[in-house]
């Protein structure tokens, strides 16, 4: 997260999970298998167990986590726990570390797969007074419904069912539906299979009703150029330095560069 900001990101997108003993942590995957030397679901491990894990164990520069590199390529391996930032961070640690950074939270799981934590997330954000400079998202419509009902003052993005409604209406030639309450953004991929999702009609329609368009996860410069030309409001990327160059190359006004 620190490196993303150093490279030019002005927001961070991250995923939230709940430990077995009820602590919210941030990690892309719902398991620790891919990044640590252990295996298991975050929901089944206590915070003490999670704190012991080396989250950089399989990391190699220029790659995501890989298991077949030469031993000397794992340049961060073994530096945790002496360097706590290489472990799995709690949500509260992230909020303390980045008080002035816009944060986008994805509630990755909910009931029945795990103990639901929608209201707990809202309570933590309220306790840090982070209700106006965050967006909460989820691929679970039920999680968003619960969160919005409990914390209507905290911004959210559209859920899957709402995105489908938008796509269907635009396909019919209808207008972008008005959004009520806490919804401030539609967060979508550029393409879904072979179908282009981010069209001029979608961008125009969303802007007409005050909804920002955020697109994930874009790492190729050519796609960044296309999206900037379409006028999207935010691009979520694993390569913020590439996006910064795209912004400079296109002479674009500043848009949100979210480091994932």
Q: At which residue positions do the language-model features occur?
A:
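Phosphate-group recognition and catalysis centered on beta-loop-alpha active-site segments
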Residues: 1-260
């Amino acid at each position: 997260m620190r490196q993303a900001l150093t490279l030019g990101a002005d927001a961070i997108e991250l995923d939230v999970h709940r430990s077995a003993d009820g602590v919210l942590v941030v990690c892309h995957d719902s398991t620790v298998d891919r990044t640590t030397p252990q295996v298991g679901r975050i929901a089944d491990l206590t915070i003490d167990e999670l704190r012991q894990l080396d989250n950089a164990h399989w990391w190699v520069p220029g790659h995501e986590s890989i298991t077949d590199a030469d031993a000397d390529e794992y340049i961060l391996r073994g530096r945790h726990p002496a360097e706590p930032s290489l472990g799995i961070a709690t949500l509260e640690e992230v909020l303390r570390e980045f008080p002035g950074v816009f944060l986008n939270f994805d509630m990755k799981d909910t009931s029945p797969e795990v103990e639901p934590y929608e209201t707990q997330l809202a309570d933590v954000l309220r306790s840090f007074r982070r209700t106006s400079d965050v967006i909460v998202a989820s691929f679970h419509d039920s999680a968003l419904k619960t969160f919005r009902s409990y914390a209507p003052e905290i911004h959210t993005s559209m859920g899957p069912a709402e995105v489908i409604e938008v796509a269907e209406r635009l396909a019919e030639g209808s207008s972008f539906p008005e959004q009520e309450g806490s919804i401030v953004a539609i967060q979508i991929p550029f393409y879904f299979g072979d179908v282009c999702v981010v069209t001029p009609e979608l961008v125009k329609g969303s802007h007409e009703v005050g909804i920002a368009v955020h697109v994930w996860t874009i790492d190729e410069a050519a796609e960044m150029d296309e999206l900037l030309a379409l006028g999207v409001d935010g691009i979520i990327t694993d390569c913020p330095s590439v996006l910064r160059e795209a912004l400079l190359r296109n002479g674009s006004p500043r848009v949100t560069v979210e480091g994932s």
